Amino acid sequence: MNIVCDKVLLSAAIDGVSKAVTMRSAIPVLEGILLKAEGFQLNLTGYDLEMGIVTTIEANVKEAGEVVLNAKLLSSMISRMPAGQVSILSAENGKTTIQSGVVQFEIQSMPANDFPELPNTGAEETLTIKTGVLKDMIDRTLYAVSQDEKKPAHTGELFEILPDKLTVVALDGYRLAIVERPVTAVKDIRIIVPSKTMTEVAHLLPNDDEEPVHISANRRYVVFMAGGYTIMSRLIEGEFLNYRNVIPADSRTRVTIDTKDFISTIERASLIITERLKNPLRISFTEGRVVVRCQTNLGRVVDEFNADCEGDEVEIGFNNRYLLDALRNARTEKVRMEISGPLSPVKVLPAEGNDFLYLVLPVRFKND
């Protein structure tokens, strides 16, 4: 293989596909990127046997061919090359020469035949959605994905696709995040996408919010195509919780709150909460105000701010981090909290509209 290409394009492509590369593996080829030159382009592939990322850049292909190079080493070298054109020459003796200007590296390559072939997913296009919409849905829900490997179905995000609606759901047993958006889909399907895949999809989506993202899916695989990248991933098997059954049907207390005021108050109260001292926040919702209290061995705090409260007065215990996560991901000037009782899941919604629905599970006080 013998090619010449632009350093900036090559560096960006390497960084993109490296998200699917295993950094430490007993199989060295899985730590590499497959480079394949043909026609007028260079194809780059990273694949960790669960997720594969492929992209293409323009190149002056003097000799077609393919080779596997260590991803970490290749990324470090290219990023430190001078600006301009980079040449890559792979010889039959297993050595690859990479040169830009007066800088020249010679590194050991790996045979392309050893690189695992990406599966033929057989996934058919299911829906097309704007980049900005999909990124917003991912960003608003990913925080609630479970880290508990004992419940693998909840370590991913549920994609519930209907002909006219896409619902993305994440939960971890303590909180729930739901975002729905109107779409036009070809078929109904319910899949669980690994959180790692969703993280990398969000990172690789183009900056143009209007650019389309093509999503193809079946029962085993999902494929995202956008911004010159194709991201293929295996799906998580298992049953996702019937999340609709845990959403309270009614509420006895409704509170409309300035989001920034609430975040600032919780952040101040959190100063006396540590990993070792995890006492819950004690939050009272009364007519016209919200009072936040907390006491640990470091000290105690009382803070309050004005709010529009309707219905029964109530005092609830919250994990400070879980409540902060919901408020920070709301991204609205005001939120509405709907409360059924001191031990029932609390709804967090936008003050107007239905952009999202978050649930936060209260914490029982020790003296209850």
Give the ranges of each region predicted by the language model.
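Structural preference for solvent-exposed beta-strand-turn elements
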Residues: M1-D368
